[in-house]
Amino acid sequence: MAVDPVTLAVIQAGLQQVCDEMDLTFSRAAFSPVIAEADDRSDGIYAAEDGALIAQGARGLPVFVGTMQFSTRHLVARIASGETSAPEPGDIYIVNDPYLGGTHLMDVRFAMPFWRDGRIFCWLSNTGHWPDTGGMVPGGFSASAISAEQEGLRLPPVKLFKRGVLDREIWQIICSNIRVADQRIGDVNAQASALIVGAERLGLLLDRYGDATVAAAIAEMRAIAARQMRAHLAAVPDGRYVARAIVDSDGVVNEPLVIALALEKAGEGVVFDFAGSSAPCAGPMNSVRATTVSAVYLAMRHVFPDVPLSAGAFEPFEIRGIEGTFLDAHYPRPVSGCAAEVSQRIAEAVFAALVQAIPERVPAAPAGTSGNFALGGHDPETGRDFVMYQISGGGYGGNADHDGLSNGCSTIGISKAPPIEIMEQRFPVLYRRYALHEGSGGAGRQRGGFGVDYEVELLRGQARASFVMDHGRVGPQGALGGGDGAVNRVEVIRDGQVMVPEHLSKAQDIPLAPGDRVRVRTPGGGGYGPAAERDPEAVAEDVRLGRYGPEAARRLFGWRG
């Protein structure tokens, strides 16, 4: 069935609007600041037969673009095999199993079948980052976990809502295995409500244009996305481009992990070969296949953002060589660092390879860490336990035309640090500092952007801090002769003494007492092009604004001021 261009455009925009409304509903109704303020969530529409991506909200985390279609695919397959009970109208499944198309345990997915005339037309699904899903440490970021069980509660696909009603028995099992369980029902209701709103809006779209027309439009959208991506790839010079990226350590063995990438471009297709990457690791920096593949998709979306979000956009890609490496984790390997950290190293490797081929389109490496900092304890003023989860921005890499953005969100999405006023209101902490990490941008013709420098103090009670970050050993890569960005630095300050974690950017279960402080300085982006070619007036302006000190400007840029 052919769909005329005008109708196709309207339906495509309508599907996007459905996803955007789900995103907004989820954020506005959520209880947790990490969802309501930091936007660590995503919503989308997926094919009934195989979970392929149809549309995804523009306000959600792009890293979920791949993982949510994989988790939906696993759900569909398990229903077909009888491992998971068959759906009925009003059912909503919950799943967070990383090995079934997921990321880490804190990313909890809901999936709801959308019914038309007694059959499933498509799936609506969303993901939200829960502040805690159990495990060794509050917040789930166990830097020294050596098995999945130590990271928290792992849920296979199971119905949390049956015919529109919350299954209290399943909910009690979940609540019995997570911290601050009394605070999660607000997020659960928000997550389910987002899907219900999506179903209402999608139903109106189908009523207006008809099921057959919308189905034909979806098929055409997928074909168009594939053609557009192939057209972009055809303009990339054929060749083999080799790059690598470094993960500081796995949190258990204090040695770097290597992501090796050979990007082979021929015609309208591209192969991403990760053979030679490090073996599976003991600690939580393993990556499940869905996250690895999604990170490649994400990186290519950064380079070619005009290609519509659809499964068709990824058809020209072949990803291989991950078997037997830490980029293809299987149970029971721990994986809490994969979604927020390893995924960004994978994207960095893709950028480092592609900048050799199309330097005008690809930047130097961004900060590439989400700055995961979890603080859990008891607040004597409220008489309640708490789990605080802080993410933070960093510098973007310079590019052919501009300096890198400062304090930008991470490579994997749009998540931003929650406002400190909200954090201070909700948790027993005080932010003593929140500023740019001066001097952190990598030197270059176009310098990297600057990271963030913040310091937070525990005001009362007792708490325990955990960190799973990266780029503490090696800063974000410069490109085409540019310098690397500054490394990530974590400090715990107690009675005037400064403690730096053994693994630099990873540690867990550090006890904090009132007056103890945590200071985090996130990386700057890599520089682009030789620093000696930077406009002297631009260097002088950076010095005037305090972005670099005079001595640093002379050393890095050869400034004569």
Report each predicted region and the residues it spans.
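Glycine/proline-enriched, intrinsically flexible loops and inter-domain linkers
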Residues: 1-89, 97-116, 120-561
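Glycine-rich phosphate-binding loop of nucleotide-binding enzymes
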Residues: 92
